Amino acid sequence: MSIDIDWERATSGPDGELLAERIRSFIHDKFQQMVLPRFIRSVQVTSFNFGTIPPELEIRDLTDPFPDFYEDGDEDLSVSSEEQSPMREQADRYRERIDSWQANSPGGLEVQMSGRMGFGHPLQLAPDEDGSRLHPLRSPINLGDINPYLFPRSGTPGIPGGTSNLGYFMPLSGLSGSQTPLRAVTRGNPFSGGWPDSPLENESRIGHGQGPPRRRSEVNVDAIQSRPSTANTGNTLFSRGSVSTGDPRHSHSSQTVLANNPGQAPEANDSPVSAVPPLSGTPPRRMREQKAEDFQVFCRTKYAGNISLSLTAEILLDYPMPSFVGLPLKLNITGLTFDAVAVLAYIRRRIHFCFLSPEDAYALIGPETGGGGGDTMEPNSLRRKNLSLLRKIRVESEIGRKENGKQALKNVGKVEKFVLEQVRRIFEEEFVYPSFWTFLV
């Protein structure tokens, strides 16, 4: 069954001009993303015209829509975003609270969180944060053999080696095993909590007469046996929920809440990111419900009209030196001819449109009768010929200025070949299934 189209009404007027401008802008953006050859500096798409000759349409079959057409799209993404808005607002409020604590609290976030988490003692801060000095060394470690030039300290009668202001969590950088209480570290007594895994981490921060400042995640040694650690509490207590909107065809939301176990102290070197591994994998596709009024039409489409596409390319001349001068080249693509099977699906105020490749068209609706009336196109012949949906494309080129009614240069073969190949590629990648276009009606 053939269909007549009022081509002039469909392509003229404000709506037709707007559609033509959108197609021109789309093709122009595709050319800007391409890697141009060395002899072409730039390509600009200047105009697109539908012409006056309509295509010939013939309905071949009426079936149910493809499953890909039922996949969630932009409309479902907006609905899911609205459903997630209360959760996102709550996450923003919590985040604003934490930011206000960090900005207004003189002692930092750890002091605030220690009281709000129900612990009896505030966190012990570094000396450079609250102005207090570290506690003197109260361990029975013999530091008499340490080089006094490394750690100068005043001599005190009755105390071997004198006093020191080195704290419990001191990294004795560069010391040998005989001078470092490795046995105490390996046995897991209270001295082991503050020894770093690598003594080279804070080697550059050891100064004369004062040990390195402790990290903010370290707690008071007096309470190390009586209450759990709240290391990195401010960073890992809450993580904002994120809604992924990278792909408009897939939408998912993830709300991640990270909290330390109150009965178990985290590792000293664990970062907030590594506390909970990131979610991996793509969520399953969300499909719409199929309804009885959904339908799909296979339509044989033949076109041999005067649709036109105008481009301007700047080519580079390498004489007498590389990229010596650039010449504007005007290309007018017209005389487009194609013969393909179009798919038109209607699903709840949406129209999905695409073309089928020759092999897919043969598998779905059978062989097509050629123009002679008797020959058929078999899939093996399609593979051998590697037929494109665009059977013919005519291009008219103009380069340089016109002198006495004649062009200075014309028919630049390399540029024409490149532009035609890219036009074919754009058409086949953007309009041939599984790629398709969706229109809201």
From Swiss-Prot:
Gene Ontology molecular-function annotations: lipid binding
One GO-annotated biological process of the protein: mitochondrion-endoplasmic reticulum membrane tethering
Compartment list: Mitochondrion outer membrane; Endoplasmic reticulum membrane
Biased composition (Polar residues): 226-245, 253-263
Keywords recorded for this protein, A-Z: Endoplasmic reticulum, Lipid transport, Lipid-binding, Membrane, Mitochondrion, Mitochondrion outer membrane, Transport
TM helices/strands, residue ranges: none
Listed GO CC annotations: endoplasmic reticulum membrane; ERMES complex
Keyword Electron transport: no
CDD domains on file: SMP_Mdm12
Membrane disposition: Peripheral membrane protein
PANTHER family for the chain: MITOCHONDRIAL DISTRIBUTION AND MORPHOLOGY PROTEIN 12
Family: Belongs to the MDM12 family.
Function field: Component of the ERMES/MDM complex, which serves as a molecular tether to connect the endoplasmic reticulum (ER) and mitochondria. Components of this complex are involved in the control of mitochondrial shape and protein biogenesis, and function in nonvesicular lipid trafficking between the ER and mitochondria. MDM12 is required for the interaction of the ER-resident membrane protein MMM1 and the outer mitochondrial membrane-resident beta-barrel protein MDM10.
Comment block on domains: The SMP-LTD domain is a barrel-like domain that can bind various types of glycerophospholipids in its interior and mediate their transfer between two adjacent bilayers.
Subunit structure, interactors included: Component of the ER-mitochondria encounter structure (ERMES) or MDM complex, composed of MMM1, MDM10, MDM12 and MDM34. A MMM1 homodimer associates with one molecule of MDM12 on each side in a pairwise head-to-tail manner, and the SMP-LTD domains of MMM1 and MDM12 generate a continuous hydrophobic tunnel for phospholipid trafficking.
Descriptive protein name: Mitochondrial distribution and morphology protein 12
Organism of this sequence: Paracoccidioides brasiliensis (strain Pb18)
